[in-house]
């Protein structure tokens, strides 16, 4: 264990998001090599035995054993930060117990996203919402969530446009990849030669979570964005990357050049040293046929931030309607990468109890 890095663990390490966590944390400058946690089915196996991602498992973790430990056991082992890839329903009580024992949790699960005192973060959009956590009781950890995978990319693309356009309403239709259902995902016979126009609870999550993230903080309360946001969701036969068709009905009528400048110039984390933050976080394409999942899902610079940028294209402005396509990597920006970036922000703000490093 490195003495200048924070001890960590991954909850649900064998899963699709868990493996992306392992990839992102294997050589992280602030977080130490994680303890890999699994359930009864995978416990005791090596990470390489359960690996499903296209790239090989990171060498630092390939031979690591998947362990079964309790929250108390993790706290006794000195773990300060956990990254949760547990399924919703399972995650809630485990995350609560970890926080009670002083272990901070950065969660990809839905269980606590709408809790009043729990930040629901996309750092480029609402970093100030981290203050919802306030001053915690002595010995308690920090709990931070990232949003639904489609909402994560959507709000990032909308953030520079909301003050410029003052939306009356926003409509989004999503074309979501198979990996959004986890591994092994959707049965092949259900999706081959097909589009499935329903994903359980997805539309409600996008609408509710986006309104909260784009809302305004006053003390420890969030006033949700006041404009309606309406979502339609479909599952399509792409492997990774969620594509979204977005229409904004605007109150203001800036020039198209102002809209493009707002998207290109948006980089609110540029002054922070957050290793997983992409610069810029929005990549604007002018080709008639972009963005595409196959070509654009790994957008993001520097190399550690691959998959963390959103790509915006087919920008069409006929006031009061702005139309565009938005693409994001559902497992990186919309999953493990979002949680890691949240942890980097919390560390930079000095909000991880027992941290090694941080600004204060």
Model features per residue range: what roles?
Residues 179-360:
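Charged docking surfaces used in two-component/phosphorelay signaling
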Residues 1-191, 195-198, 222, 228, ...:
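N-terminal Rossmann-like NAD(P) cofactor-binding subdomain of oxidoreductases
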